[in-house]
Amino acid sequence: ASAASRMVTAAGGPGSDGRPLIEMGSRRTHEWAGVAAARAAYIAGFASTSNLQARLSYGVPSSGTSAHAFTLVHDEERDAFRAQLTSLGHDTTLLVDTFNVEQAVRDAVELAGPSLGAVRIDSGDLPAHAVSVRALLDSLGAKDTRIILTGDLDEYSIAGLAVAPVDGYGVGTSLVTGSGAPTAALVYKLVARSDTPTADDEALDYRRLVSVAKRSVGKPGRGGRKWAVRERSASGDASTERILLAPPTELGPEDRVLLHELVRGGKIIGREPLADARSRHAAALADLPSYALQLSRGYPAIPTVFGTNDEEA
């Protein structure tokens, strides 16, 4: 609640004088803690939450937007926009930074018309994007279309955006963690989808999966289903972790495939006894070279290389 209050103040204060904030932090905390955070944020002046349970439990107004995965699961960005507009109407908020912001804004206005509700920008130079997108929207006749910014915002970055032509913010991580606490910026990123509308085993064969990836500045993705192999040096120590875009076919005698099936059809199949897990951890540590155990910030224990054999992914 304290973090939310600071953010509301940084955004200009509660009510009509400030820019509205949407609480979007449920994916960063326990599911019921997310509901509690949404309630606390609303008390502190947030306008709404993306958590539907908070609406059901406490009557907190709900709002939201689409995810990058929604765009990536479509063949074209325009297809994703068209589907969202058909389902939610022209007052919806379209996410425009999956590939190219300028082209996405043009497509969004072309499909929705000047009555488009809002566009959301989640990456890149947010102040610069806000200025250029505002100018572009105005030139296309969408002068009432709002600009919503998201992307690891906190009270300090919100204050820094005070002079940018922005209409609102979405805040997640910094809100639900109380702001100022260390966090791991780990999120779900869609990297591949089936080339058929079915989800049977044949459709999920890696050779039939379509590689997809976000290409926005600052948050690019690396598309494709992946396999990981830990390679060993001549001395027997783990030397490299190689990420492949196809099942490994040329393994050294001591190389180890790292991926193992744990869940199949929604059922856990890979659970191991506690003693076995403890032994496996000890064996994995013994594989590492001595320098990998140094506590040095910014250096990997062992390097990760992308590519199949000599071909980079």
What do these predicted ranges mean?
Residues 1-143, 155-160, 164-165, 177, ...:
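Buried, small/hydrophobic-residue-enriched core segments of structured protein domains
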Residues 140, 145, 154-313:
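Gly/Ser/Thr/Ala-enriched C-terminal appendages of enzymes
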Residues 148:
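Contiguous mid-protein beta-loop-alpha structural module that forms a pocket-lining wall or clamp
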